[in-house]
From Swiss-Prot:
HAMAP family: 16SrRNA_methyltr_H (MF_01007)
Membrane-spanning parts: none
Main location: cytoplasm
Annotated GO MF terms: rRNA (cytosine-N4-)-methyltransferase activity
Protein name: Ribosomal RNA small subunit methyltransferase H
Family matches, as Pfam families: Methyltransf_5
A Gene Ontology biological process term: rRNA base methylation
EC number: 2.1.1.199
Primary enzyme class: transferase
Catalytic function, reaction form: cytidine(1402) in 16S rRNA + S-adenosyl-L-methionine = N(4)-methylcytidine(1402) in 16S rRNA + S-adenosyl-L-homocysteine + H(+)
Amino acid sequence: MQTIPHVPVLYREVLEQFKNIKNGIVIDCTMGYGGHTSLILDANPNIKLIAIDQDQSAIDFSTKRLEPYGDRVVIKKGRFSTIIKEILKEYDISDIRGILADIGVSSLQLDKKERGFSFFSENLDMRMDEDAPLNANIVINEYSSHELQRVLLEYGELRNYKQIASFIVSNRPFYSAKELSDALRHLMPSGKKIHPATLLMQAIRIEVNNELGELESLLDTIQERKFLDTKVAIISFHSLEDRIVKNRFNEWRASCICPQEAMRCTCTNDNSLGNILTKKPIIAQMDEIQANPRSRSAKLRVFEMKK
């Protein structure tokens, strides 16, 4: 008997968006341990769900957890930016009613110290796909100072990124996430509720897993293929991701795609892909935050492609 590891973030809000689907296919781009997947399947008995994940341990767990759904669920291993393109070759795009992506590291990955995501881990790894070639050890101990500066500035938005990069290069090698975060504590912003090394670890993790590139690629595919009558829901956990989603949804909603400097519209003014269903991002309710403090940073934005 498997123990269900956790309740998925924003579970009520996600279910509200993906209920009463009469038929068709829903794609869960970030299956994890099957929380959102099972909720959506239970709420919509006539749909099929394609679940994607790159973490083999999550796939092993969810394969067993989702067995009762039989052929209603198909699990695919890999990065969603790649797998969704394969799905569109196998299935009719007109059958796809929903796309869900819960971006970022899962609670289960954070809690497994051997994965190297935690500040207290004795490893430097941070790979969501443990077969991927790039890991945190390479970023920290082999990247040049210039490369580290790019990572810390672009993905951590750290003001003293040059100072931190210089310190890392001068004091490496580092062998664990704990050693790294402890050594850099004096250079990290303090006085906030978050751990001083949060932005540092975020920056390294994003680099290792190409998280922003994956998100951009997913949104590119959705935009290029012009899904019809499909609901797209993205959960993000920090401002970099949320900014990408917000800006892209605004682009999709726009009817006119002429350059801002254009004197008059020459694009037919009929290019809108649909409507934004969330004027502001949906956030977790207080009872969920109390039960799962990590849900505090979760933001859900939803776009509905036109019919």
